[in-house]
Regions:
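Short, charged beta-strand/loop "edge" motif centered at a coil->beta-strand transition
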Residues: 14-44, 89, 94-95
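Well-ordered beta-strand positions
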Residues: 11, 40-42, 49-51, 75
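C-terminal boundary/linker segments immediately following FHA domains
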Residues: 12, 54, 60-101
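A short beta-strand micro-motif
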Residues: 1-3
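Generic structural signal for coil-to-beta-strand starts
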Residues: 46-47, 81
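Residue-level detector of conserved, well-ordered beta-strand and adjacent loop positions
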Residues: 20, 51, 61
Length: 101
């Protein structure tokens, strides 16, 4: 995944990766729409997941279309963009791009 000109690789054996406003998160954002521990990415049972633990939800756009989740999880596959708390067309600077292959 990449964001803010940084690239981070999440491998199958890695623990979960947190995304949010907290400085403890791997991907940190300052938007008021992003929760302190907004979402986490992890590998489980042969697939990558994004689990949303936020107030405002997470938008994911990939090869299958756009999905909105809040307080739930979704399989992340292919390539695409993740936006925290606001629709993708409102958050160009705070987007996370991903490729799973």
């Amino acid at each position: 995944m990449w964001f803010h000109d940084e690239i981070h690789e999440i491998k199958r054996g890695n623990k979960e990766v947190w995304i949010g406003r907290s400085p403890d998160c791997l991907a940190t954002f300052t938007s008021r729409f992003v929760s302190r521990q907004h979402a986490r990415l992890y590998f489980e049972d042969g697939a990558y997941y994004l689990a949303d633990d936020s107030t405002n939800g997470t938008y994911i756009q990939n090869d299958d279309g756009e999905t909105f989740i809040t307080k739930g999880k979704v399989i992340v596959k292919g390539s695409g963009v993740i936006s925290l708390g606001v629709p993708l067309d409102h958050s160009e600077s705070d987007q996370i791009h991903f490729f799973i292959g």
